[in-house]
Amino acid sequence: MRKLIGRGGPFVLTGAFVLSGLLMAPLIAITQTAERSRTQGLKETDKFVKAGGNTSEAVGTAKLQTQKTLDAYNALVTQPSKNMKGDYKKLMKSMDSMNDQAAEAGRKVDQMQQAGDIYFTGRAETIKNIQDPQLQDRAKQRLVDSQKDFGGVIESLREGAKALEPFRKQLSDQITYLGSDLTPSAMASLKPNAEQFNARGSELFAKTDKAIATANAYFQGLRSAES
């Protein structure tokens, strides 16, 4: 037994008190670790969901810009132009924006993949802290299912971007072709392929829209309910 002097007078520090403090310290540390783990998991989820939203938006923007470029191309090729040079300059500007947006979409998909790796690794670590075996198995299965769904999401986005790439390059080639011979006869020479080219574009745009919708639904399911 030890007697300590404080401002309010002496108080006794018993062995039981010391033992209680020693036992409580690990419990407090475990609680703090669990709290940090839970908070970190929420942060990682938020970052993952945000990365998914940014990716869907970037892919959608790239698709819309490709559509705008195709529309500008169609207007120049299929309709008489009173200002051929001016319209072509606008088309070139639209094409440059299309290429920039496509590159940005590719970067966002890669960033989403990285965020997914961090999210799923952290989630797997958190599951290890579940003591109930049945509950832990259920959490593991949900993790596996979520990873599988995410694999489908990212694959569909990559496939959508991959499918648009040759179309975008072909569109760029035809725009360059016009630039080398900016005459009414050159435009007329492209008209026979315009309808088929546009039909192909519509099919690819629809495929991209479907991929974006799938991604949005997946990430919406990961959002925490907010009061």
Predicted segments with their positions:
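N-terminal secretory signal peptides that target proteins for export/translocation
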Residues: 1-7
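Long amphipathic all-alpha helical oligomerization modules
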Residues: 43, 47, 158-227
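Bacterial N-terminal signal peptides
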Residues: 12-25
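Immediate post-signal-peptide N-terminus of mature secreted/exported proteins
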Residues: 29-100
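Extended amphipathic alpha-helical interaction segments
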Residues: 108-191
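Long amphipathic alpha-helices with heptad-repeat character
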Residues: 52-66, 95-98, 102-116, 150, ...
